[in-house]
Amino acid sequence: MKSIIHFSIFLLCITGPFVALSQGITEGAKVTGNIQIDGQYYTENETLGITDSSLNYRKTGMNGFANLLYTNGNFSAGMRMESYLNPMLGFDSRYEGVGVPYWFARYKTGSFEMTAGHFYEQFGSGLVLRSWENWALGYDNNLYGFNTSFSPIDGITLKGLIGIQRYFWEPYEIGNRGIVKGFDADFDLNEIFEKMADCQTRIDIGGSFVSKYEKVPKVTYVVDSKYFIDSVEWNKQTVYELKLPNNVGSWAARVNISNGGLNFYSEYAEKSNDPNATNGQIYKKGTALYSSLAYSTKGLGVFLSTKWIDNMSFKSKITETGTPPMLDINYLPAISKEHQYSLAALYPYATQPNGEFGFQGQIDYKIRKGTALGGKYGTSLTLNYSLAKSIKKDTVAISPITNSWVGTQGYKTNFLSIGDLKYYTDVNFLIDKKFSNKWKGTFGYFNQSYNKNVIEEGIYNENNMVKANIAVVDLTYRFTPSKSFRLETQGLWTKEDKGDWLSMLLEYNISPTWFFAISDEYNYGNPSDDLKIHYYNVAMGYTQNTTRFALRYGLQREGLLCVGGVCRYVPASTGLTLTITSTF
């Protein structure tokens, strides 16, 4: 309620002068928005362990939001209302409630722009700062404060910001999270220097500095020691305080070079010592490097990316942990491919901020139509490979005070070193083929290695490596331009974890209004006969103009939902789900 009042007062103060000087606030104004409501009704399922007790005696869950955006010339303002009554399964219970966690007022004049209120921002690739939101993940780390952007001359863009991060509904107080400050400068050399204006090679360089101030909690350790005086044993207790930094700074430098279909990007970042709950309270500085190379021409696309990160968890609260990770100031770009097919996405990768080497390569090739392999319509091929491994670490001696690595450098490592421990690999190959005006299909093969201990438990060994092979056949038959039928079959085979899976989906579409679907994921290879479960679902949807209703009933298997290397655990559930979306 306070957020709504604050937004209303601020909006009136900002817009008041404009109203007085114009014919009215509605002249030239535009109002847009969108709404989404996700509701669930849960039923018990003894096999999946879903009981009234596990549901906390709540039969329903509802997540919803409404965005409203007002624009008038150089001025814009917006707000988002959210409701979690109760939060759906898998979402943090601290979201429960109703309020306005996001509102802003923005004004732009010439080359200057200022935002007051809540905002999202990213410097470079996000290695030192990225504030973003993903509704499906239940993730939102928007900043509340001021954000400015200024271009003194063509080709130079300067940004500055200060704010606090959203933390569910918790109001900011000194000590419950830190204050984030940042500055970014971007230089387009082709625009700055007249001699480079017509050069085919485009060069852009930039740099960022981000810091956080946090009133950190006091952490002490008591060490007992014994000594003798006149053959009498005495005990002595010495209290040591862990000196935690109130200010933590980070910086990054980047370059982007492009020429025609060739594009190279690289960014290097460092973070000062930042002992926190994620790294085990060690004092080693953080380092990160992210680079990508892309090439595209007619019929061919190649993309390569790599990253090396060491101790780069950067939060505005040093004690914060959890999945998904809240209060992250920065973002470590994902290196693995996000798959659209459910069994291929059964084992997704989650970024490891304490140390990771990653590589991804992808080739997209279009076989020309009229050839033996291309056929009448041509054929699209995609080959993708991704790898994540540890970095080499040589641990230092433990502290005699804490009897652990707390309070030490933790370990030593060489920049760009690669360790022996494998976190994740994924090799996949997709074929997209149109056979006729009525038939088209997608055929895929995936080979994955998934270190369950590392990704899910934070245990760094290979004692629980899941190796899986997945195959996909996805066929679509179009009866008329508006009516189609789709058959999707998937198989996953592994000797580890929950064993083999088989999935099938039947979908009928009447575009653009109706869809009907029935699906089943069968865990027929589960080592436990009681858990060889059919995860069946029936669904339908209706669309009218910009409003869509979707209804689904069935079982949801447990697992991780990941977007960009950030993951949320989704528990098993059974029941009815209704989703309503609308835009205006």
Q: What is each PLM-predicted segment?
A:
Residues 1-32, 583-584:
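Bacterial Sec-dependent N-terminal signal peptides
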Residues 72, 107-109, 259, 544:
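Structural motif
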Residues 24-30, 36, 41-61, 71, ...:
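Signature for the C-terminal beta-barrel architecture of outer-membrane proteins
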Residues 64-68:
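Histidine-anchored nucleotide/phosphate-binding helix
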Residues 105-127, 131, 135-148, 152:
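Well-ordered mid-protein domain cores that form the structural environment of catalytic cofactors
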Residues 539-549, 554-556, 570:
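Long, ordered, helix-rich scaffold segments
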